[in-house]
């Protein structure tokens, strides 16, 4: 099976008007060579308008180019997935659509990746899961945030599920790089 999609988009994000009258093009393709296996590539090229350039004091549009490649195997309660993402284009001083000042200090490249797996320990009842992920907001190791997770999912019924996870985080942007998280979550489906 082969799937593709492409779109031409206007605007600066959800409920945001267009600031530079330019369009973004977003598309993707994926193939499914065997049942349960999907391999894909996705891309986005466009601009973000009305950005204040701190070096000139004027507003301008900045280019943004992003792509991702991914692979997934999902069959008989076994799931394995990996993805790499890359972004090129200047970011804003802080997150959100209301901040319109270019941040040259962070550079114009970022990337990240993750791999994870879920396997059944007791079919239909108990699954073990593990995940490793990295995000580098300057596409270098001195700004990386790395996270290792492991956990269990227990299904009381098809509509009631308990998740338990332990995570170790190494955030090189912080003075104290390493910290740990424990997360418990109860999901109701209706």
Label the model's feature ranges.
Residues 28-30, 68-72, 116-118, 151, ...:
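Outer-membrane beta-barrel architecture
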Residues 31-35, 74-77, 121-123, 154-160, ...:
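Outer-membrane beta-barrel strand-turn architecture
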Residues 178-190:
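Outer-membrane beta-barrel "beta-signal"
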Residues 4-10, 41-45, 82-86, 130-134, ...:
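Transmembrane beta-barrel strands of outer-membrane/channel proteins
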Residues 1-38, 42:
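Aromatic- and glycine-enriched pocket-lining scaffold segments that form the walls
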């Amino acid at each position: 099976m082969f799937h593709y999609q492409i779109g031409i988009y206007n605007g600066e994000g959800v409920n945001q008007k267009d600031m530079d009258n330019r369009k973004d093009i977003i598309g993707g393709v994926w193939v499914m060579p065997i049942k349960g296996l999907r391999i894909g590539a996705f891309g986005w090229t466009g601009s973000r308008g009305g950005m204040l350039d701190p070096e000139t004091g004027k507003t301008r549009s900045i280019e943004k180019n992003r792509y991702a490649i991914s692979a997934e195997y999902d069959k008989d309660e076994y799931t394995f997935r990996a993805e790499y993402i890359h972004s090129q284009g200047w970011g804003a001083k802080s997150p959100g659509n209301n901040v319109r000042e270019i941040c040259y200090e962070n550079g114009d490249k970022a990337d990240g990746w993750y791999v994870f797996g879920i396997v059944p320990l007791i079919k239909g009842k108990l699954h073990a899961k593990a995940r490793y992920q990295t995000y580098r907001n300057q596409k270098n190791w001195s700004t990386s945030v790395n996270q290792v997770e492991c956990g269990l999912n227990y299904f009381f019924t098809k509509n009631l599920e308990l998740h338990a996870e332990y995570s170790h985080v190494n955030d090189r942007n912080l003075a104290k790089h390493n910290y740990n998280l424990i997360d418990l979550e109860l999901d109701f489906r209706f």
